[in-house]
Amino acid sequence: MLTRKTFHAFRSISGPPKKSVELPKYDLVIVGGGIVGCATARQLLIEKPNLKIALVEKEKELAVHQSGHNSGVIHAGIYYTPGSLKAKLCVEGLDLSYEFFDKEKIPYKKTGKLIVAVEQEEVPRLDALFARAQTNGCRDIEMIDSKRITDIEPHCKGLKALWSPHTGIVDWGYVTKKFGEDFEKRGGKIYTSYPLEKIEDNLKDSNYPIRVSSDPSYADFETKNLITCAGLQSDRVAALSGCSTDPKIVPFRGEYLLLKPEKRHLVKTNIYPVPDPRFPFLGVHFTPRMNGDIWLGPNAVLAYKREGYSYFSISPSDLLESLSYSGMQKLVKKHFTFGIKELYRGIWIAAQVKQLQRFIPELKYSDVTRGPSGVRAQAMDSAGNLVDDFVFDSGTGKLSSLIMHVRNAPSPAATSSLAIAKMITSEAITRFKL
């Protein structure tokens, strides 16, 4: 599990309210204390400061899962389909993020990023990626030759590369907590250790038509409107208000290696492969971290638990749910060889090092150790397709006009979080008549 920086200034979060406590009634409750939930809560109070808003989170603190278990990259928006929400919100979110970091004095580094073609057959795909980046409005992207590659990254070898100077790194878990701090400073209230169990019609007060409940020993929340940003649990939370189970969240664990401290000089910037469209993930890469570490990887394997960060973290019910899903079975059939190779690279470090040596030939097996892991909430449809864009839903029934669910917010959701928050806030103000 990753080590996260403790944000000592943030002390005002409340634990779960006991049944005996009479809670205030809220204009809006937000479920999920990750980066999208916290950014959205903050943005709503920026635009509508008189609203009474609560944010509930099932863990003891904010940013425990995806928001605190990620590569820390600030993405430029290169990869994403032109016209998609991913492309639009990432490019917008990049600038909003740097503006926020500067204003709040949050440490970050503009390390840049190389996407490197090491074989001739990869060059046409790199050219297509360059065209896509330009269509998406990514700033200052360059196509560079092998000499420029070594000028930027002396130990990296390649034929051609895309150079993205505005790609950077930051501690997204810390950023999430800053969003939460700002939300509370503006009058919002955060309740942790509150796992959501029910979303119901509130029969007690028609002015607050939604009842949100947890453990029977905890108080219920009564609210006019509800937004859920539940990450790895997003499909299950959406189902509580009658939404379809599709797309389903299938958890994929990514396992990193660490470059030993005496070898950190080998890597200065983010180094990525040219993505292969035949496969569903980007491939192994080199990622500098704010603390000076260099992460190598990750692979991508099915997690045995929704929030399972190791091979020994297993939930039989979660695993059965993933394996019995028709979409997962179709994905396995389509990418069986790829999946076996990913599993093999996770078990045998030398296999992953061999992939990394394509970019830095002098890297050795003895230069690396096992590192941290994260779990990605990947939405998948019943046909076995990985859902590639953000998905929002409301479900059906009496309460559907009062509820918004964020069903899929994969990478680059952290980079895009402030732009996503603006979009959700605009939609909420219109739909909920706030």
UniProtKB/Swiss-Prot annotation:
- One GO MF term: 2-hydroxyglutarate dehydrogenase activity
Required co-factors = FAD
Per UniProt, which keywords does this protein have? FAD, Flavoprotein, Mitochondrion, Oxidoreductase, Transit peptide
GO CC annotation terms, alphabetical? mitochondrion
Gene3D superfamilies membership: D-Amino Acid Oxidase, subunit A, domain 2, FAD/NAD(P)-binding domain
> Does this entry carry the keyword Electron transport?
no
What is the superkingdom listed in this entry's lineage?
Eukaryota
Family annotation (Pfam families): DAO
Q: Where in the cell is it found?
A: Mitochondrion
Give the top-level enzyme category. oxidoreductase
Kindly give the InterPro entries that the UniProt entry links to this protein: FAD-dep_OxRdtase, FAD/NAD-bd_sf
Q: Which SUPFAM superfamilies match?
A: FAD/NAD(P)-binding domain
Return the EC number: 1.1.99.2
According to UniProt, the reaction catalysed is: (S)-2-hydroxyglutarate + A = 2-oxoglutarate + AH2
- Which family is this protein grouped under? Belongs to the L2HGDH family.
Instruction: State the name under which the record lists this protein.
Output: L-2-hydroxyglutarate dehydrogenase, mitochondrial
Upper lineage is: Eukaryota, Metazoa, Ecdysozoa, Nematoda, Chromadorea
